[in-house]
């Protein structure tokens, strides 16, 4: 069980870093389209 957590932790951290970047990129694209 501990091995599963050890492999999931890095994935969760990466997702936590990537998702906000993707959201900000989407917002920029939407604002560009509106303008």
From Swiss-Prot:
UniProt entry tagged with the keyword Ribonucleoprotein: no
Propeptide: 1-10, 21-35
Gene Ontology MF annotations: toxin activity
Keywords: Toxin
Ranges that cross the membrane: none
Modification after translation (UniProt): Processed by the macrocyclase-peptidase enzyme POPB to yield a toxic cyclic decapeptide. POPB first removes 10 residues from the N-terminus. Conformational trapping of the remaining peptide forces the enzyme to release this intermediate rather than proceed to macrocyclization. The enzyme rebinds the remaining peptide in a different conformation and catalyzes macrocyclization of the N-terminal 10 residues.
UniProt KW DNA damage keyword: no
Entries under InterPro entries matching the protein: Amanitin/phalloidin
Cross-linked sites for Cyclopeptide (Ile-Pro): 11-20
Top-rank taxon: Eukaryota
Summary of the function given for this chain in its UniProt record: Probable toxin that belongs to the MSDIN-like toxin family responsible for a large number of food poisoning cases and deaths.
Family that this chain belongs to: Belongs to the MSDIN fungal toxin family.
NCBIfam families registered for this protein in UniProt: amanitin
Protein's UniProt name: MSDIN-like toxin proprotein 1
